[in-house]
Amino acid sequence: MTGLPRGRFLVFEGIDGSGKTTQLEALAAWLPTSGLMPSGASVHRSREPGGTALGLALRQLLLHPPDGTAPCPTAELLLYAADRAQHVETVIRPALAAGDWVLSDRFSGSTAAYQGDGRGLPHLCIAELERIATGGLTPDLTLWLDLPLAASLRRRGHRPADRIEASGEAFLARVGEGFARLAQERRWWRVDATQAPEQVAEACRSLLRQQLGVAAP
């Protein structure tokens, strides 16, 4: 027992190119001196897929499979669920129990948007699978970095696309619409990701101060 209160679980969601990784790193650097965290608590950076050793192997299968081995939509959904179950059980829950804070680049919202809205798999089935994979764990706060698809495509430029990114603009448009719907249904906090990175970072910091009850300095 650490004597610390339960940690916080914060998630960044959004389409590719929205700046999730950049903003997660910025927030992780700011949090220890923000006044939000109790003394002695640490920040854990993570991501999905790939937040565990097993998850890294699953990430390779999902995003860069060998020729001829790409999973079908249902298999894709199950692989993401396996990644999340391992992530929750071996990384997130232990860290929270120790009083630490966990920042994750994607969580269950991405599955609902990509495999539900994007692939067209039944949302009720996805929700039940998520309940099993997470054991009912939900984020304390989800920041949705809202970026139009055209801006996402421009930012990605000529960078090689992974298998999900290469699924086509119509697919990615459905994913973006899914994120917008989920943000309303799940009461995520929207951040305008078309702004400069430092403006986005300040918006994220402001939301955390507002939601966690600490006034801006």
Task: Kindly label every feature range from the protein language model.
Residues 38-134:
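ATP-dependent small-molecule kinase phosphotransfer cores
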Residues 20:
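Conserved lysine of the Walker
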Residues 2-4, 28-30, 150-217:
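NTP-dependent small-molecule kinase module
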Residues 5-9:
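Pre-Walker A (Motif I) flank of P-loop NTPase domains
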